[in-house]
Swiss-Prot record:
One of its GO terms (molecular function) is tRNA pseudouridine(55) synthase activity. HAMAP family: Pus10_arch. Keywords: Isomerase, RNA-binding, tRNA processing. It comes from Thermosphaera aggregans (strain DSM 11486 / M11TL). Pfam families: Pus10_C, Pus10_THUMP_arc. Substrate binds at residues 333, 405. The active site is at 268 (nucleophile). Coiled coil: none annotated. This is tRNA pseudouridine synthase Pus10.
Length: 441
């Protein structure tokens, strides 16, 4: 027998004593009593479990009364708190009617009929939103939570199930059995939240899982913001945003409340995004239509000014990864730079040689200090390539870390970026155009 372990057998006498002790103080219906012993037995509902426990207690109490270990008054009090089958036993013993007390937890309101009505209300909400895969959530009123906690604390039961869990499970099972909808704990289309007050009045609210689409976007024009940008005076600062554009194309087909975007960083509003594009996730909020074909979606969002291409469905994890890794992804920028003095080809060669695998120290740019903390960050520039445009202007391709403020790399930002192009060329420089050519995926 070496190495094998033998589980401790159930002490049925102890279980019945616990039931008696509990019912001597609290009136409990079958559902609520069974729930406090939920981890005993297999394949039983809490109602069946509670009824069985009361039957077992009835055997003990009849024997105790016959052996004069319990008196009439104590037996009557237990019958009042337990209800059937103890009330029937007492009525036969004493030829006296017993009026059972209402359940301390639910007031006797939990029943198969009540659960059926909740399941029907949940189904109606799911049907309105064309949801077939769902989960049930429960929010209890404070008074109910306190009662449940009081009883568990006083009894010390360790094999109990919460009221929330019972309602979630039983309602989910009934919706599946009666209406054919499938509980899906991995990828639910919606969560039906049953909100209960202390009188077990309920209402059902539906939290619809958004449709998430993974793709990339290109901005072919300038002065296009990520999200609507309002001026301090209340008017629009820029006429178009990527989020509004997508909402205008997708909200109606999906019958959605709104559309949001999550991108791997963001370029300046006056910058274009060319090349393979910037990764993003489109979040379609509270859609009543969930089925879609990716090719049809791409046709809806096709445009010359803002080009968005959806590749596949996304998850919340995809959004997290976009946010977490955007600073790690290297980028290539194209800048058109204007100088206050003539720039020679030799100076441009010097610039290329200097900005080769070099660390750049940047404080938060002055232009965004009103909305971001003033911190020092270090980013690397791996390579710079230049091409003269005129005697006082040139193009620069910059290959660098994500998170580098590339405009400030040009003009130094009053010494807050070091080193910078202006300090090496010893002249005043201004970036007049910026394009994002490549973002590491």
């Amino acid at each position: 027998m070496g190495g094998s372990s033998i589980s401790t057998p159930l002490d049925f006498n102890k279980i019945v004593e616990d039931v008696e002790k509990t019912l001597s103080k609290y009136p409990l219906c079958d559902h609520c009593l069974g729930r406090f012993f939920a981890k005993y037995g297999l394949g039983l509902s809490n109602r069946e479990r509670g009824s069985s426990l009361k039957t077992m207690l009835g055997f003990k109490l009849y024997d105790d009364y016959s052996s004069k270990r319990i008196g009439r008054d104590s037996l009557l009090a237990l019958a009042e708190n337990a209800g059937e089958p103890l009330t029937r036993m007492v009525e036969k013993l004493f030829a006296e009617n017993v009026n059972p007390k209402t359940c301390f937890i639910c007031g006797g309101r939990i029943s198969d009929e009540w659960l059926d009505s909740v399941a029907e209300a949940v189904y109606e909400k799911l049907k309105e939103a064309s949801v077939t895969r769902f989960v049930v959530g429960v929010k209890l009123g404070r008074n109910l939570r306190e009662k449940e906690l009081q009883l568990v604390t006083e009894t010390g039961f360790t094999r109990a199930e919460s009221l929330k869990n019972e309602i979630k499970r039983e309602v989910g099972k009934k919706v599946m059995a009666k209406y054919g909808l499938v509980p899906d704990f991995e990828k639910p289309e919606a969560t039906a939240i049953v909100k209960l007050d202390e009188n077990f009045n309920y209402r059902v609210e539906l939290v619809i899982t958004p449709v998430l689409l993974k793709g990339v976007y290109n901005k072919r024009g300038r002065n296009i913001s990520h999200v609507p940008w309002l001026a301090k005076q209340g008017g629009r600062k820029y006429p178009l945003s990527i989020q509004e554009y997508l909402e205008s194309r997708l909200a109606d087909p999906f019958k959605a409340k709104k559309v949001k975007i999550h991108a791997a960083g963001r370029e300046d509003v006056d910058a274009r995004t060319l090349g393979p594009g910037r990764p993003l996730v489109i979040e379609i909020v509270e859609p009543l239509v969930r089925s879609y074909d990716i090719e049809d979606v791409n046709k809806l969002i096709r445009s010359d000014l803002v080009e968005v291409r959806v590749h596949k469905p996304a998850s919340r994890r995809d959004i997290e990864l976009l946010k977490q890794t955007s600073r790690e992804k290297r980028k290539v920028y194209r800048l058109l730079v204007v100088s206050s003095t003539p720039i020679s080809e030799a100076q441009l060669n010097e610039l290329e040689a200097y900005f080769n695998d070099i660390a750049i120290q940047q404080r938060t740019p002055i232009r965004i200090l009103t909305r971001k903390k003033d911190v020092l960050r270090v980013r690397k520039v791996y390579e710079v390539r230049t091409k003269p445009v005129s005697s006082t202007s040139f193009e620069a391709l910059v290959y660098c870390d994500g998170g580098l403020y590339v405009k400030e790399l040009v003009h130094c930002d009053q010494g807050r970026t070091n080193p910078c192009f202006a300090s090496i060329l010893n002249t005043e420089l201004k970036p007049v155009e910026l394009d994002v050519l490549y973002i590491e995926h």
